[in-house]
Amino acid sequence: MAKTEQDRLKKEAAEKAASMVKSGMILGVGTGSTVAFFIDALGKRKDNDGLKLKAIVTTSNRSKNQLEGLGFKVSELADVDQVDLTVDGSDRVADNLDGIKGGGGALTLEKNVAINSKKIIWIVDESKLVHRLGGFPLPVEVLPISCEQNFKRFKQEGLKPQWRMDSDKRYITHYGNYIIDLAADPVPAPHGLADYLDHTVGVVEHGLFLDMCDEVIIAHSDGTIEDKIK
């Protein structure tokens, strides 16, 4: 799919999601190229419809800067009550609405916002859809002190670990940690793998977002917009 066509689909899905935001909400805003279109659509709603939000929290400085550039005030997650709605993208979405996220490296904050949200909507184009989770590296954020042992253990488990790189150096997250991308495809037993990672010393967070998403807005190449609701 050509990038211009993919961007058109992302914009359509983002505008659909923006139409569902209501004044007075505490809104969570995610990270990524699709979310950038969503933020632009929010700005238009503020200017044209008088949209006024109680608070906004974001999962990246990129989204924060874009929102502030459009006149929105951005709060810290710790300073708000439960988030009413979070709109985010997803790197892959399975038939049951489970997802892989964190391709941009912000998985820890993304998950913290998600678990503090009453409702979660993901906006994607059809290229992100899979029957079973896979087709995209699964990011695992790890502490530097234990990262080498984590890498060896993941390799022994057959999870095909790879270091996330930034040019010729290991990628460093917002929290000063490293990311190990697991290339096992498809993801073996997602719930079992999530439990394994949750109980592995040195793992800060992983990109399996299971039983979290309530709705996915999908832009298809034929121009249709599909709503999938759990």
Curated annotation (Swiss-Prot):
CDD domains to which the protein is assigned, alphabetical: RPI_A
InterPro entries: NagB/RpiA_transferase-like, Ribose5P_isomerase_typA_subgr, Ribose5P_isomerase_type_A
First-tier enzyme category under EC: isomerase
Catalysed reactions, as listed in the record: aldehydo-D-ribose 5-phosphate = D-ribulose 5-phosphate
UniProt pathway annotation: Carbohydrate degradation; pentose phosphate pathway; D-ribose 5-phosphate from D-ribulose 5-phosphate (non-oxidative stage): step 1/1
Gene3D superfamilies reported for this sequence: 3.30.70.260, 3.40.50.1360
Chain ranges passing through the membrane: none
A single Gene Ontology CC term: cytosol
GO molecular function, one term: ribose-5-phosphate isomerase activity
GO biological process: D-ribose metabolic process; pentose-phosphate shunt, non-oxidative branch
Keyword Isomerase carried by entry: yes
Disulphide linkage map: none
EC code: 5.3.1.6
Keyword tags: Isomerase
Catalytic residues, chain numbering: 110 (proton acceptor)
Annotated positions binding substrate: 31-34, 88-91, 101-104, 128
Family: Belongs to the ribose 5-phosphate isomerase family.
Function of the protein: Catalyzes the reversible conversion of ribose-5-phosphate to ribulose 5-phosphate.
Subunit organization: Homodimer.
Official protein name in the record: Ribose-5-phosphate isomerase A
Source species: Lactobacillus helveticus (strain DPC 4571)
